[in-house]
UniProtKB/Swiss-Prot annotation:
One of its GO terms (biological process) is DNA-templated transcription. This is DNA-directed RNA polymerase subunit beta. It comes from Sinapis alba. GO terms for cellular component: chloroplast; DNA-directed RNA polymerase complex; mitochondrion. Keywords: Chloroplast, DNA-directed RNA polymerase, Nucleotidyltransferase, Plastid, Transcription, Transferase. Its EC number is 2.7.7.6. It catalyses: RNA(n) + a ribonucleoside 5'-triphosphate = RNA(n+1) + diphosphate. It comes from the Eukaryota.
Length: 1078
């Protein structure tokens, strides 16, 4: 936990701890279990049969969730769901004799949340992300029409996202728009909702305006409720003629209009009461005539210049749809399906004169399948990204504008994507995705939490003057509350108590940023990085970087691969420990005790009169193929305290996040090998296993029962060389510990097939006729190791489902570990958006070296710094060098300039000066060019002309590795329509020669290469076949005569538009045209 003392200028102000990073997910799931379940179960209606003799009902007070029988780890390996069974008491009541049969019944499984804040569904870790939606309520806006006149509208948004728009025209008539083309008078709508004219005029502030557009025709329409409903129905459903009033017409209108557009919900009722100054009870969640009339009054006031317009992008007008809301919606859907099942079962039982027991009326299928399909297919339920510990923890804190009821990447405008002042302390202004979803997927700030009404709350210190002594208390404010306070920014200069009265501070008030006197401040921020997300808070010296580069850095830290030997960063921000702890990657002691035994698989701890065995994760594959592994950190016999680290996980060291390595870097050009973000590295990084990582790939095969018989797993595979089968055991499955190469058989499998007599080869028929040998009719369908898959087999799993039918096949999974050193084509990055690709690996002796003889590890291009304005990397680089020489680690909170001007530079120079004195190396800090040093060319031994910045920044190796990207194709599949090669590595696709590539080839005048690209290698079917033949037998390749397939396709498409394409040959001699069809 980070202490908030000193960061705020005064040590007496108390401390503040950062909340758990998984807390948002846990609180949401707890709210669903504690409140949402009961709410939805209590809505389940009493179900009666047609004759009203039997009644079925649920007693929700006694619901019970049973602890899962399976462990999390087993659920992952066996592709099962980690869920809890839900039991509820149900009663079947006979109304004739008032007898009741009560029984505890099982109604389905609910997936549980684990300690990481995720769920395991079908063996896959999934996380539900929070969605930002427009909050239900009423919003007033004005737009200019084509004449440049302001048109005022009031939009009522329902809980379901449906909209009802009120608008006022230039004659001051008020209309309710029910569709894009249809609108009806406000009087008709109010009458249809049950008000008469007298009530309407009594409940409005401007009755004369309402009377002004009351014509005789209008009076007839609102003469009775039935007339108003008929008029409304006619306009809403666009029905011609004269419809007749009936009960079914009312029901249809209720279902299509009032339920979708007038259900406000709990939040909507509160918002409308607050906006229109009403006092309607909270349990009244539907739109009332009173609301409509108050909204119309407000709209008239707007027309006459009273009242304020609403900012739709302000966070007070948004609500967060959390895990609890999404799971509760799904439970409601499942119970509605269950209701239909129970009705059908009761009806069938009565017809057959049977009275089934209570459990037989209910099936668990609706609930179980609803949740499985939600976690499997809902856009807000995503596969947990487990590249490294940071990625796991950040994924659950995402906020998305996308998803059902939200926006799409194509329709969202710039104003929605932009940063809004109300995001301060709630949504990170930096951390968002790049590309089409920029600004639509954000990340929660560190201290933000979701309030009871679905609003995002942020904490502030309140300054209370009490007997001339300032007292501090912490408040959590929603976006609608903090508008009324002057809030001092936490990154302002530290306040000197002596001259406080004279100081002015930057502050925020009503969405504006001002500079005000200290006495006027009501609240102040509690942390300097309160408004950043976790990813952005891990960037040291972030205040010296351009925001675009900080955005790239927070995204790239999530792509860092855990290395085989992790290392703590020398320069950090102080959040690294909490990120590691909350990610659940290190093993932590649950109580104090003594270590009895430790090895790579488990740690045995004794304490509190019991012995606890803590299993460790060994070579577990994440869904990004990275290796999750725990290493014990405590010796046998050691006494430990509760909360102490027992074992480090992937990318953690001593309980701190460790994503990369501190390497010696020089910023200088080197023979053009670091042009345009390329990076030159020393071979020490390869041979020293500095950037070596382990990757685990999973290959699986299923065995089905076909119509010809079951498929067989066997080692006896005819027609295959013994070399390919060398690693199989007697069952036909690869042995643990085997080294396998591309093309090797991992699982031998034969699929039976029917063979006709005519399909046998002549020699096979001869063998059958003479010797009576039965020729094999099985087809070889083995699991082979694909290209680029070499490695060591570390695990084999044979998952046998119950009742191995064709729908429930057996699955064999083989896990292969690969050791990957860093190589040319891999991507590396710092923590300031400074990314690059390895262009060359130089021998150690050729690398530039320092004045103490040490060769540098990496050479970056200095031109990558000034134009991109990420100067933080220079501070980190120099301070890292000082830290490595002094053997110190620095944890620096951002915005340290609040203490004094140029604080970062002073800190770096003072540490370099101290390192220079302690190590007696004057080159570490040379006053003529501080931070730079003269270094030597490794090839010649001569010094370079200019002094160069050298240092030890923290550099990460990213998951974009050349082994996963490199691809070649000689021949492969073609698209059916265009007959051109497919696209993409996974489909063995080709490389596209587009329009600009054709221009380049034309520019060089390479006619033959260009013709090959457009014909043989692409979509000329006959020429392709001829090339293959002539290549085998030798000879000249024939030239393609006719047009390629894509041109034929163009001709066919033109024909479908009734356009015939012809071309003509014009004779040079007599200019006669010879017509010839294409």
């Amino acid at each position: 936990m980070i202490n908030a003392k000193k960061m705020l200028g005064d040590g007496k102000e108390g401390t503040s701890t950062i909340p758990g990073f998984n807390q948002i997910q846990f609180e949401g799931f707890y709210r669903f279990i504690d409140q949402g379940l009961i709410e939805e179960l209590s809505k389940f209606p009493k179900i009666e049969d047609i004759d009203h003799e039997i009644e079925f009902q649920l007693f929700v007070e006694t619901y019970q969730l049973v602890e899962p029988l399976i462990k999390e780890r087993d659920a992952v390996y066996e592709s099962l769901t980690y869920s809890s069974e839900l039991y509820v008491s149900a009663g079947l009541i006979w109304k004739t004799n008032r007898n009741m049969q009560e029984q505890r019944i099982f109604i389905g499984n609910i997936p549980l949340m684990n300690s990481l804040g995720t769920s395991i569904v079908n063996g896959i870790y999934r996380v539900v992300i929070n969605q930002i939606l427009q909050s239900p309520g009423i919003y007033y806006q004005s737009e200019l029409d084509h004449n440049g006149i302001s048109v005022y509208t009031g939009t009522i948004i329902s809980d379901w996202g449906g909209r009802l728009e009120l608008e006022i025209d230039k004659k001051a008539r008020i209309w309710a728009r029910v569709s894009r083309k249809q609108k009806i008078s406000i009087l008709v709508l109010s009458s249809a909702m049950g008000s008469n004219l007298r009530e309407i005029l009594e409940n409005v502030c401007y009755p004369e305006i309402f009377l002004s557009f009351l014509t005789d025709k209008e009076k007839k329409k609102i003469g009775s409720k039935e007339n108003a409903i008929l008029e409304f129905y006619q306009q809403f459903s666009c029905v011609g003629g004269d419809p007749i009033f009936s009960e079914s017409l009312c029901k249809e209108l209720q279902k299509k209009f009032f339920h979708q557009r007038c259900e406000l919900g709990r939040i909507g009722r509160r918002n409308i009461n607050w906006r229109l100054n009403l006092n309607i009870p909270q349990n009244n969640i539907f739109l009332l005539p009173r609301d409509i009339l108050a909204a119309a009054d407000h709209l008239i006031g707007m027309k006459f210049g009273m009242g304020t317009l609403d900012d739709m992008n302000h966070l007070k007008n948004k609500r967060i749809r959390s895990v609890a809301d999404l799971l509760q919606d799904q439970l409601g859907l499942a119970l509605a399906r269950l209701e239909n099942v129970v009705k059908g079962t009761i009806g069938g039982a009565i017809r057959h004169k049977l009275i089934p027991p209570t459990q037989n009326l209910v099936t668990s299928t609706p609930l179980t399948t609803t949740y499985e399909s939600f976690f499997g297919f809902h856009p807000l339920s995503q596969v947990l990204d487990r590249t490294n510990p940071l990625t796991q923890i950040v994924h659950g804190r995402k906020l998305s504008y996308l998803g059902p009821g939200g926006l799409t990447g194509r329709t969202a405008n710039f104003r929605i994507r932009d940063i809004h002042p109300s995001h301060y302390g709630r949504i990170c202004p930096i951390d968002t995705s790049e590309g089409i979803n920029v600004g639509l997927i954000g990340s929660l700030s560190i201290h933000a939490r979701i309030g009871d009404w679905g609003s995002l709350e942020s904490p502030f210190y309140e300054l209370v003057e009490k007997s001339k002594k300032a007292q501090i208390r912490m408040l959590f404010l929603s976006p609608s509350q903090d508008e009324y306070y002057m809030i001092a920014a936490g990154n302002s200069l530290a306040l000197n108590r002596g001259i406080q009265e004279e100081q002015v501070v930057p502050a925020r008030y009503r969405q504006e940023f001002l500079t005000i006197a200290w006495e006027e401040v009501h609240l102040r921020s509690i942390f300097p990085f309160q408004y950043f997300s976790i990813g952005a808070s891990l960037i040291p010296f972030i205040e010296h970087n351009d925001a675009n580069r900080a955005l790239m850095s927070s995204n790239m830290q999530r792509q860092a691969v855990p290395l085989s030997r992790s290392e703590k960063c020398i320069v950090g921000t102080g959040l690294e420990r909490q990120v590691a702890l909350d990610s659940g990657v290190p093993a932590i002691a649950e109580h104090e005790g003594k270590i009895l035994y430790t090895d790579t698989e488990k740690i045995i701890l004794s304490g509190n009169e019991n012995t606890l065995s803590i299993p460790l994760i060994m070579y577990q594959r994440s869904n990004k193929n990275t290796c999750m592994h725990q290493k014990p950190q405590v010796p046998r016999g050691k006494c430990i305290k509760k909360g102490q680290i027992l074992a480090d996980g992937a990318a953690t060291v001593g309980g701190e996040l460790a994503l990369g390595k501190n390497v010696l870097v020089a910023y200088m050009p080197w023979e053009g090998y670091n042009f345009e973000d390329a990076v030159l590295i020393s071979e020490c990084l390869v041979y020293g296993d500095i950037y070596t990582s382990f990757h685990i790939r999973k290959y699986e095969i299923q065995t089905h029962v076909t119509t010809q018989g079951p498929e067989r797993i066997t080692k006896e595979i005819p027609h295959l060389e013994g070399r390919l089968l060398r690693n199989l055991d007697k069952n036909g499955i690869v042995m643990l510990g085997s080294w396998v190469e591309t093309g090797d058989i991992l699982v031998g499998k034969l699929t039976p097939q029917v063979a006709k007599e005519s399909s046998y080869a002549p020699e096979d028929r001869l063998l059958r006729a003479i010797l009576g040998i039965q020729v094999s009719t099985s087809k070889e369908t083995c699991l082979k190791l694909p290209i680029g898959g070499r490695g060591r087999v570390i695990d084999v799993r044979w998952v046998q489902k119950k009742g191995g039918s064709s729908y429930n096949p057996e699955i064999i999974r083989v896990y292969i570990s690969q050791k990957r050193e860093i190589k040319v084509g891999d991507k590396v990055a710092g923590r300031h958006g400074n990314k690059g690709i390895i262009s060359k690996i130089l021998p150690r002796q050729d690398m530039p070296y320092l004045q103490d003889g040490r060769p540098v590890d990496m050479v970056f291009n200095p031109l990558g710094v000034p134009s991109r304005m990420n100067v933080g990397q220079i501070f980190e680089c120099s301070l890292g060098l000082a830290g490595s020489l002094l053997d110190r680690h620095y944890r620096i909170a951002p915005f340290d300039e609040r203490y004094e001007q140029e604080a970062s530079r002073k800190l770096v120079f003072s540490e370099l000066y101290e390192a220079s004195k302690q190590t007696a190396n004057p080159w570490v800090f040379e006053p003529e060019y501080p931070g730079k040093s003269r270094i030597f060319d490794g090839r010649t031994g001569d010094p370079f002309e200019q002094p160069v910045i050298i240092g030890k920044p923290y550099i990460l190796k990213l998951i974009h590795q050349v082994d996963d990207k490199i691809h070649g194709r000689s021949s492969g599949h073609y698209a059916l329509v265009t007959q051109q090669p497919l696209r993409g590595r996974s489909k063995q696709g080709g490389q596209r020669v587009g329009e600009m590539e054709v221009w380049a080839l034309e520019g060089f005048g390479v006619a033959h290469i260009l013709q090959e690209m457009l014909t043989y290698k692409s979509d000329h079917i006959r020429a392709r076949q001829e090339v293959l033949g002539t290549t085998i037998i030798g000879g000249t390749i024939p030239k393609p005569e006719d047009a390629p397939e894509s041109f034929r396709l163009l001709v066919r498409e033109l024909r479908s538009l009734a356009l015939e394409l012809n071309h003509f040959l014009v004779s040079e001699k007599n200019f006669q045209i010879n017509r010839k069809e294409v």
